[in-house]
Structure formats: C-alpha cells, structure tokens
Amino acid sequence: MRHHLLLITLLFLAYSSYGQEQADSTLTTEEIQFRDSIAAINTNNERLQLIQETYNAASSAFAESNFSKSITLFDEVIVMDSSNSAAYYNKGLAQKETKAYALAIETLEQAFVLDTTNFDALFQQAKCYTNNKESQKAVIAYDRLLLADPSFAEAAYDKGVIFYLEKDYQQAIAAYTQAINIDPNYAYALNDRGSCYRALEDYDKAIADYLQATKQGDQAFLFNNLASAYRKSGNKEQAIRYYSKAIAVDPSYEMAYNNRGTVYFESEDYDAALKDFKAAIDLNSNYAMALCNRAAVYHLQEHYTGALADLQLAVKLQPNNATALLNRGITREMLRDVDGACQDWQKAYDLGLEKGNEYYINNCE
C-alpha cells in the first residue's frame, strides 16, 4: 500500500512538472521578454549592491589607514565596474598614502579620463609629484589643472609654495598673485606673498600683504609675520604691538615671545627681553634660539654662569650652531676657561664663522 502511495505521489509530481512546462510554453513573446527583463534587473541589482558594499568596505579601510586593504578592495570594485571613476580616484589616494607616487599618478589619470570634471584628481597628481620631489613636473601638473579649471586657487597657491621653497621669489609672487586674483581673501596666499616681499626686503609691500591677511582672521602666525616685517623696516613700536597681538591670540606661541624679546633686547629694554625669553623657554625648554638670546642678556648682566648653562644646552641641541659656539667661547673666557673657549672658537671657525677665527687668533695663539 505504501508503495502505491509513493508511486502515485511521484507520478503526481511528474505530471505537475510537465504541466508547469506546458504552462510556461504558453507564454507570449512579450511575456517571456518581460520575465527575462525582471530577472536581468534583479541580477543587476545584486551586482550593484555588491559593488556598493565593496566600495564601502574599501572606504572604511581607507578611513582606518589600512591602505593596502583599501587598494585591494577598490581593485575589486574596478573589476566589477571599470568605469567607476570614484574607485580609481580613491585607489589613487590610497596609493599616494603608501608613497607609491608613480602608481598613484597613473590611477588618478584614469580617474580623470573617466570623469573630466574631477579636477581633484589632477590636484592630487600634482601633490604626488611634489611629495616625490619632482617640482618641475608638479608645476606642469598645477598649470594643467589651472588650464582645466581657472578657479582652482589652491593649485596656484601650491605652485607658489614650490617656487618659494626654491627661493625663486619672483615666480612665487606671480603664483601667489594668481591665487589672490582668484580669491582676494586667500589669507595664506597673502601671507606667503608678503614673506616673498620680506625676503626681497620690500617691507612696505610685505606689510601691506600681511595686514590684508590678518583681516581674514585672527591667526597668531599672521600677526607674528606682520610684526617681523615691521621689525625689519625699523618700526620697533609696531613690531612689539603685533608680536603682542600674536601672543594674545595664542599665549602658547613661544616664537612670538622670543621675537618680541629680541625687539626689547634691540631697544635695550633688557628686563622685558629677559622676561620674554624666559616665557619662551618655559613653553619649550629645548628652544635653542631663546636659550641663546637669554644667554646674551645674562652676559650683559655679567651673570656668566647662567649664560654658560643656557649656551651649554643650546649647543647640545644644535651642535653645529656656530654663533652659539662663539658665544659659549666668550662666556668660557670670562669664567677663565681659556682652553674651552679656544676649542669653541676653533669649531665655530670650522663651521664657517670667520669671527671664530678672529677670537682664536687674538686669544689662543
């Protein structure tokens, strides 16, 4: 009996299957096409979902600084979708983070080919050239970007930085001016153009640019630079004023304390100078320049042991600081350590400071 039941069941299933096949065969061409299109849509949706999930995983790996994993996952996205410009772009960024600059440049180029509105891809290419110390290629890349997008102020600014670091101040001024023409309120471009003018000893133009930069926001380094231009121009009062503004904005700005102290020193206000140098050293006990400056005040006050202590530390921090060695030699002589003084003067001369040789000849031969 059980065998008959099984047979009937099997026959029923077989007939049911046959009946389904017969039913399918009765679909019209339009119905079959509709069915197939739905299946294709479902398959494509699954593919798109997988691409998105893989892209998200790659982005998460990038955010976690796991750049190797990020590159692998972006490659998987590209295999599934070779026209995905964003995947190429972010893969290029990950390669840049691993310092694989040549590979990054190629990948970023592909990102731009796929999306010619992605000017950031060109910008990052230029960054790769800069990081790889290929400054000429970086400049060409920035020029290409500015030709494609004349409103990209940061490209002009970064080009200026390259020229500034090479001490090509006229070219730097031209690039910074290009950035400022795009964005008249570009504080960094105004500041850095001012620094070019300061290096060229055109202090009026430097002051004008620094003043304009400070109007864009209270940033301590802007006031510090403005003060330095006033100091270079001989306007000590304005220099002290703006160094004080820098300190007011950032009370932990040790450089501004040291610089203001230098102006006080030049103005022979040694008590105020000493106070500022001490403040700078309290903020940074390894600030060699401030140590040397405080030693100069101590020396004038005939506090030679204090001066020597500061200069000892300064030389320890900067063994090739010829001026610190010269001054330590002078201080050692005042403390009757002639042999130590002569050694310092000789080394200062060996480092290129002619004054060291003068002291050595006059006191050691």
Where are these regions (language model features)?
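Bacterial Sec-dependent N-terminal signal peptides
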Residues: 1-25
